[in-house]
Amino acid sequence: MKIINKISNFFSKKTISSSIRNKLMMDWSSEEKFFENRIKREKLRLFEKRPHIVYYFHSLTDPYSHLTCQILENFVNKYDVELKILFVSDPHNVFTPEKKMFEDYCLNDASHIAKYHGLKFENASQPKEKNIVIAYKILNFYFFQKEITQIDFIKLLIKISSSLWLNETDTFNEIISSFGEKEKEIFDTLENSLLKEGNNKLSDFGYYFGSSFHYEDENYWGVDRLNHLEDRLSELNLRKENSQPYIINYSQNNFNLENLDQGQIDLKVDFFPSLNSPYTYISFKRIREIFEKYPVKFEVKPVLPMLMRNMKIPPVKAKYILSDAAREGRKYGVIIKKIYSPIGKPAERAYSLFPIINDKGYGFDYLEKLMESCFFYGENIGEMKYLEKTISDLGLSWSEIKEELKNNDWKKLLNNNLNEMYKGGCWGVPTLRLSKINSDYEYYQWGQDRIHFIEKEIISILNFNHP
């Protein structure tokens, strides 16, 4: 059996050893191998005399794709690359656990992203199926039968996508009515083969979502990861003009806390992490900055890792998560180095001590140490000697704390935390919840790349309450 098949079985059923799992995770997140691969790919491209080709994968039913297509014209004008636009189907269900929640979350998330980056998102519901069919048919016609410049095709794509998300068909009817007689004959009989090439390419490139770019063995998801692609192209001197370094600017907001009466603050931030998540690991530093910088109450609410909740993570998704988390971590000065995945008994032991440690005020510090051990030092957090040293380093009594290893109360606590997380339409980590004490107000965000939304909301509330 090929190793990839073993990996596939492993990530859903835990059928290979932890040592193999840990090595694969380290390979996928290795900073050294990451940059070595970039050098190797550029040498290969030069040897094969290939142009710089960036692939973009668009899905008409994906709200993130609607946002991303709006920056394509800027991208083409800014970089000396060949952009190939391909179309893809919805991802397989194995990549989207909790599918209905996933769809609802994406709609809400895309709306937030659009407002933050000055993009347009016209609707808060999925497009109608009959409109999707017509939209793909029109694009299929222009893609294969009509002579059109790439810029004009991008403008057409934005026009079609906007109409689709508005659930209006006037634009479609206008386009179809503009066809000549022969064009209408071709249009009426044309088979829709638009998705075939895109689906095959996306799979070959080891990815699964639309709204993504691919350049020389590396995937970049939507406007969120566009900065990584732009950095790489700029390093290759492919920027056409001396302009802003990024198409999407990630503005930072600041708030003056000097004259604030902190006794009046009633904001609370809840942080939902899990011990096997590289995205959670790279978020701890920024989460700490939030509760140290802003006058908010803070509580950490750990949950079980997805794999310990019987959720499947296919190997291609696991590989992308590790490589992307490492790439994002480097952006914030947090390195993934040696990995020891705590799935199973190590996580259970470590979690069992959390309630008493948290009651003593060290819950966040404890989990932060565990995450550093899992993703930087490569230590087994389930070993008794490790736990004893970690507890002692926190200034706590090991003889008292270790008694909780016999207690199963942590299971109920983590399950309650999970239910709270699900209440906000989130099933993955890290999740953050901002709330007002003695109020029904709750604001959820999921993902280390959404921490800035929580910060922005805190600032907005503080500015409103304290002009």
Regions found by a protein language model. Name each.
Residues 2-7, 11, 20-26, 34, ...:
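C-terminal cap of thioredoxin/glutaredoxin-like
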Residues 30, 35-52, 56:
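An N-terminal domain-cap segment
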Residues 42-49, 256-264:
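Short boundary motifs at domain starts and secondary-structure transition points
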Residues 48-64, 78, 82-83, 264-278:
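Short active-site neighborhood of thiol/selenol oxidoreductases, capturing the structured segment around
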Residues 59-60, 97-98, 185-186, 274-275, ...:
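Short, contiguous strand/loop micro-motifs
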Residues 59-61, 126-127, 270-276, 340-344, ...:
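Conserved strand-turn element in the central/C-terminal portion of the radical SAM core barrel
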Residues 60, 66-164, 282-374, 465:
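Structural alpha/beta surface segment adjacent to cysteine/selenocysteine redox centers
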Residues 102-106, 190-194, 279, 317-321, ...:
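Soluble or luminal CAZymes and related metallo-dependent hydrolases
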